[in-house]
Amino acid sequence: MSTTVRQFSSSTSLKGLGGGSSRLSCGRAAGYQAPSVHGGSSSYSVSSRIVSGLGAGYGGGYCSSVGGGLGGGFGASYGAGYGAGFGGGFGAGFGGGFGGGDGILPAGEKETMQNLNDRLAAYLDKVRALEEANTDLEVKIREWYKKQGPGPERDYSPYYRTIEELRSKILAATVENANIVLQIDNARLAADDFRTKFETEQALRLSVEADINGLRRVLDELTLSRADLEMQIENLKEELAYLKKNHEEEMNALRGQVGGEISVEMDAAPGIDLTKILAEMREQYESLAEKNRRDAEQWFFSKTEELNREVAVNTEQLQSGKTEITELRRTIQSLEIDLQSQLSTKAALEGTLADTEARYGTQLAQLQALITSVEEQLAELRCDMERQNHEYRVLLDVKCRLEQEIATYRRLLEGEDAHISSQYSSAMSSHSGRDAITTSRQVRTIVEEVQDGKVVSSREQMALTTR
């Protein structure tokens, strides 16, 4: 809080009716400082001068100037004349006061403010000139368009049909190319499938040939075994024939021996019946030969059946193995075809994935750039808003200060009007009463308490001295 003390002193001298002069001087000392826009401080002072005279009329003038570090100034002038009538005026302007007052700005700051005012005026003049030039150009453009008028439009309808035909041909060619590409891809896949089938069939053929070669070796072994068995059968037959022949020879020999013997009858114990013995021996040999034949036939048939069973079992196993191998090869072929199709699908999906990733990467980069630009614009807008808010607060502060100063000056002017009227009436009464020279001095002291740019309290003291 700061306290402002204003002191007004006035002196009056009166003479005769022929002429006279009255002087009122007012001095103000104010200690007030307020923060400026750039963090500094500004101060102001008020100086005023009133000159009045009596003669054919009474006139007075008042002028004051206010300047400050806020970048603006206030000036006012007041004048009154007595004769034809009484009138008053009040004016204000930025940049400094005019009249008989002393400015509160230093010489350098006054020149700076004047330069700024000149530059502002020149800028406004340029703006007006550019607006006028823009208006002239718009008028000229409208006139030119009016003079030119709408030209005759060409009829492009015949070309539209040609364009549609060409578009349809292009679309048909595109579809045909796509079909050809699809057929080429299908032919390539079919060729790959046929190549795979050929390789599979070739491998199957080689394996079948290998199996046939193995079966041929088995057949050769079986043929050799059969030949061996046939040779054994022949040997057994020869042995049987040889045994039969020996048996017949022995029988014939025994018969010859029996036929050539002399029969001698003796009265003795009965002898051995050789015929019976030979018959028994024949039966024994025949039974032995028959047994050997049956055994050989049984062994041959058993071996043959065993070999036939082995051949049948091996043939069944071979056939089942061939069937299983064929099914396995078909399964392998179908699995290879599925593998090729899956690999083709995988390659196509990988290509699509790469394209999609590239496309979305590009879109993401564009969105990121857009987000960055929007964030930059938002930051700039935020900075502009903060700057404008700061400027608004500063201007609002300046406006409040100027309104306070204007109110103060208005009170001062109202007080000066009252003083001038009282002095005029006292001068007229003094002139009518006596011609002696009377000097009076009136001291007016105003004490104001200002807190945060607002007047909290105001006190006024007046002192009058006459001599």
UniProtKB/Swiss-Prot annotation:
The top of its lineage is:
Eukaryota, Metazoa, Chordata, Craniata, Vertebrata
The segments labelled Interaction with Type I keratins and keratin filaments in the record are 419-467
- Name of the protein in its database record: Keratin, type I cytoskeletal 14
> What's one GO BP annotation on this UniProt entry?
intermediate filament bundle assembly
Q: GO CC annotation: what is one?
A: cytoskeleton
Any Pfam family hit: Filament
> Superkingdom of the source?
Eukaryota
Give me the ranges of the annotated region Coil 1A: 109-144
